[in-house]
């Protein structure tokens, strides 16, 4: 397996292009199943999870064509992909593909809405606690679907005449369930109302794409989304939003090294909660013509408390990076994880580097230390792995991050982007 070797202590200075948002791209790719026309997506990131979704869509008969890179005012806007599901060759999403990524379950709603049936393996992905698909299933059942779980598969069929609109109240906020049901409702009969819906920018991005395909959707970005079903949707062209998690990650990397970077393409409105909390830690965000400039205010990094929350709160996908940042703060920080269980697996690895962290249930108390020390560490999931990279950038000596295949699931060319800003690091490719 590949590893990253990092020699820390060098401030990051320069500009970093922000890639298209993985968490927007995956549901947008699944949306191609809703139409026999061509869905063209620009600013597609080059990631392992994107490849997994492409392989899954190909299994369903989708014709996939990559057309290089689109150019825009800010330079390269990522890859452009054309997805055409003229006919659905299979309504089964097999275990060998779905096990690699939990977002694969997003084909369930589109397949069921268009074909009247779907057989989707229960999903895999990062090992960070349970993420049951119950909310997806209950929502589709409210729309008239018959669903059973057998042999590790969700087996669903729509009623005669197709899915029907319904009022669906989520007992808890779920991004994936909101996306799945919004796509299914776009082809359902009548009106669907999603109450306590997720409000993430990725939800709004999906809604904008579906509207371009002919869907009728109101309220995306609020907790009440209204969808009026259409008989059919058409193809469309859509540009994927920049990745707010990558934006926050590189902002924290710049801050922990005492550097200054411009995040090209980043949007402040997507990370307001992050910018507000980091401002309390003495980190400045400045909007520029190209994106955002990030730097420490007075050279000191102050400890600040953080609780993860659904958008517009602080994202759980930045919790591990925030913990790494707080390891060298002045004072202490209490970090509370309210979204997922078992998401502190990076703590023992940060401790190997000299971090002072005590876990109490869903909270971790981080007491700042003057300096972290390089060490061999092991990545356990996507966001934990990048927190170790952030820590390594600031640590004295050499840090080796093992099992970085997790990183490739969510960060495009991360070592290239960091090296371009002065980081001393390289990928070591294992041949065995």
Curated annotation (Swiss-Prot):
The active site is at 126 (proton donor). Pfam families: EPSP_synthase (PF00275). GO terms for molecular function: UDP-N-acetylglucosamine 1-carboxyvinyltransferase activity. Keywords: Cell cycle, Cell division, Cell shape, Cell wall biogenesis/degradation, Cytoplasm, Peptidoglycan synthesis, Pyruvate, Transferase. It is an enzyme of class 2 (transferase). UDP-N-acetyl-alpha-D-glucosamine binds at residues 102, 131-135, 317, 339. Pathway: Cell wall biogenesis; peptidoglycan biosynthesis. The modification 2-(S-cysteinyl)pyruvic acid O-phosphothioketal is found at residue 126. One of its GO terms (cellular component) is cytoplasm. It catalyses: phosphoenolpyruvate + UDP-N-acetyl-alpha-D-glucosamine = UDP-N-acetyl-3-O-(1-carboxyvinyl)-alpha-D-glucosamine + phosphate. GO terms for biological process: cell division; cell wall organization; peptidoglycan biosynthetic process; regulation of cell shape; UDP-N-acetylgalactosamine biosynthetic process. It is found in: Cytoplasm. CDD domains: UdpNAET (cd01555). Phosphoenolpyruvate binds at residues 22-23. Its EC number is 2.5.1.7. Signal peptide: none annotated. Belongs to the EPSP synthase family. MurA subfamily. HAMAP family: MurA. Cell wall formation. Adds enolpyruvyl to UDP-N-acetylglucosamine. This is UDP-N-acetylglucosamine 1-carboxyvinyltransferase. It comes from Rhodospirillum centenum (strain ATCC 51521 / SW). The gene is murA.
């Amino acid at each position: 397996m590949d590893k990253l070797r990092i020699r820390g202590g060098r401030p990051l200075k320069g500009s970093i292009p922000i890639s298209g948002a993985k968490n927007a791209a995956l549901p947008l790719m699944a949306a191609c199943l809703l139409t026999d026309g061509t869905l063209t997506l620009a600013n597609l990131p080059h990631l392992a999870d994107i490849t997994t979704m492409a392989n899954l869509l190909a299994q369903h008969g989708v014709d996939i064509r990559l057309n290089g890179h689109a150019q825009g005012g800010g330079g390269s806007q990522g890859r452009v992909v054309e997805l055409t599901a003229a006919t659905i060759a299979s309504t089964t999403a097999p275990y060998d593909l779905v096990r690699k990524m939990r977002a694969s379950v997003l084909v369930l709603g589109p397949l069921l809405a268009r074909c009247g049936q779907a057989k989707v393996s229960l999903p895999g992905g990062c090992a960070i606690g349970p993420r049951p698909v119950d909310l997806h299933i209950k929502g589709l059942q409210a729309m008239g679907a018959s669903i059973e779980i057998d042999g590790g598969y969700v087996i669903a069929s729509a009623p005669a005449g197709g899915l029907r609109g319904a009022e669906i109240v989520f007992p808890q906020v779920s991004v994936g369930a909101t996306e799945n049901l919004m796509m299914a409702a776009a082809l359902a009969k009548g009106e669907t109302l999603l109450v306590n819906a997720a409000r993430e920018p990725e939800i709004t991005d999906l809604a904008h794409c579906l509207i371009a395909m002919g869907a009728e959707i109101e309220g995306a970005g609020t907790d009440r989304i209204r969808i009026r079903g259409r008989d059919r949707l058409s193809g469309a062209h859509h540009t994927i939003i920049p990745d707010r998690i990558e934006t926050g990650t590189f902002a924290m990397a710049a801050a922990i090294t005492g550097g200054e970077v411009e995040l090209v393409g980043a949007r402040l409105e997507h990370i307001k909660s992050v910018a507000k909390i980091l401002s309390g830690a003495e980190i400045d965000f400045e909007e520029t013509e190209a994106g955002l400039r990030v730097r420490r205010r007075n050279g000191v990094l102050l400890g600040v408390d953080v609780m993860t929350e659904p958008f517009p709160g602080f994202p759980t996908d930045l919790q591990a990076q925030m913990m790494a940042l707080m390891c060298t703060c002045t004072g202490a920080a209490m970090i509370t994880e309210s979204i997922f269980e078992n998401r502190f697996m990076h703590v023992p690895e940060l401790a190997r580097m000299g971090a002072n962290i005590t876990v109490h249930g869903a909270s971790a108390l981080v007491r700042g230390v003057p300096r972290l020390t390089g060490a061999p560490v092991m990545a356990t999931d996507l966001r934990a792995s990048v927190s170790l990279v952030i820590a390594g950038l600031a640590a004295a000596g050499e840090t080796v991050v093992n099992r970085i295949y997790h990183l490739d699931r969510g960060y495009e060319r991360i070592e290239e982007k960091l090296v371009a800003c002065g980081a001393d690091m390289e990928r070591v490719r294992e041949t065995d």
